[in-house]
Amino acid sequence: MKNNSIRGCAYISDKIFEIIRNYTIKYNDIYITVAGTIGDVGIVPIEYNGANLTENADKLLLNNQICKDWFVLYLQSEYCQMQIRDVTTKVGQPKLAIKRIEELFIMLPPYNEQKAIYKKINCLFDYIRT
């Protein structure tokens, strides 16, 4: 889970699946890495629909007042990444606790504004790529 993509998947036995069956991700879910490379964020692609989530990442569930695409860009922003670095535990193996994610300061504009911001930024990214 890096650079808005998922690679290097491992497979588990049916026995393990029964134990962790509640920790799955679906197509279009938002994920954030919480151990190893901390703070990478992305949206689950269709080919990983139903995949199991490890302890190195969390699934983020949003209410209907938050535009998913805008929220991913916000989490990837330097402002939010700085907050993530500040709240990551640094003793032993660095880790980003769920409680710390819940406490991140999110500047939440109205939904229509979120969509407009995402659309504008996405157009700029398209322009940069060409």
PLM region spans:
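Short Ser/Thr-interspersed hydrophobic loop/turn segments at strand-loop and sheet-helix junctions
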Residues: 1-3, 23-40, 53-57, 72-85
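Sequence-specific dsDNA recognition surfaces
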Residues: 1-27, 47
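Short, conserved catalytic or interaction motifs in soluble domains
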Residues: 36, 46, 62
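A short glycine-rich beta-alpha junction/loop motif
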Residues: 37, 50-58, 66-69, 89-111
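Short amphipathic beta-strand starts and helix->beta connectors
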Residues: 44-46, 87-90
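Conserved aromatic/hydrophobic "specificity hotspots" at molecular recognition or selectivity sites
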Residues: 60, 64-65, 120-124
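Interdomain signal-transducing alpha-helices
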Residues: 71, 75, 114-117
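Amphipathic alpha-helical coiled-coil/heptad-repeat segments
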Residues: 83, 87, 103-130
